[in-house]
Amino acid sequence: MTCFARWDDLIDKSKDYNEILIMPTWRSWLDEAEDSTFLQSDYYKNYSELLHSERLNKLLEEYDLVFNFYIHPKFKDYISNFNVTSDRMRLIPYGEEPLNELMMRCKLLITDYSSVCWDVYYMNKPVLFYQFDYDLYNTIHGSYLDMEKDLFGYRSLTLDKLLDDFENACKNNFKQPREYEIMRDSKFAFTDRNNSARIVREIKKMKIFD
């Protein structure tokens, strides 16, 4: 096992920024849906509720945080349907800022089922999983992880639980919970930013170019 070459470029920059990143993945059943259909979806309703949460806004103020909402590229045309009521929240259209930069700057990631969780976890930052539509998503998409047993971050099915977990993370200065710090050693064979070199060595061993 070599780990991904792209992880060599990941540097934790969070000490210089007070940013939270939220990046949910897409839903195949909403792909290319009309705006009228999208606006009636649980996806839109739940993320809109989060963005308009008074409790969340108070936490952002209290801990001097900026909340970056970065929509999946397959849903980029829907971002105009979202709005925020706080200058501590930013709606970032796909491509406007490099995703890896947002991941490096964030103190914590909120996602649902997106594989970006691995990049953030690689940097040993806390991840919160917001899975309000888990039953439907699991039925249609399935998963390579057991979402009830194998996640490396606190899981919530409701907004209240998510905000409880987020508030606790704020109070703990976004320190990785001990249980997930220990788990990290079993998830990554290496965390030394030498993955590219290992990949090259393994390719040479295969003697593909002889």
Regions found by a protein language model. Name each.
Residues 1-3:
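Helix-loop-beta element that forms the nucleotide-linked donor phosphate-binding surface
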Residues 73-118:
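Donor nucleotide-activated moiety binding/catalytic core segment of transferases
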Residues 11-12, 99-104, 138-144:
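Short, charged, surface-exposed secondary-structure boundary motifs
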Residues 5-81, 156, 191, 195:
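Conserved catalytic-core segment of nucleotide-activated headgroup transferases in glycan assembly
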Residues 17, 105-106, 124:
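Short, well-ordered alpha-helix to beta-strand connector turns
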Residues 192-210:
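C-terminal alpha-helical cap of glycosyltransferases
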Residues 59, 101-102, 148:
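Structural alpha-helical scaffold elements that stabilize or flank donor/cofactor-binding regions
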Residues 82-84, 115-187:
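Catalytic binding pocket for nucleotide-activated donors in carbohydrate/polymer assembly enzymes
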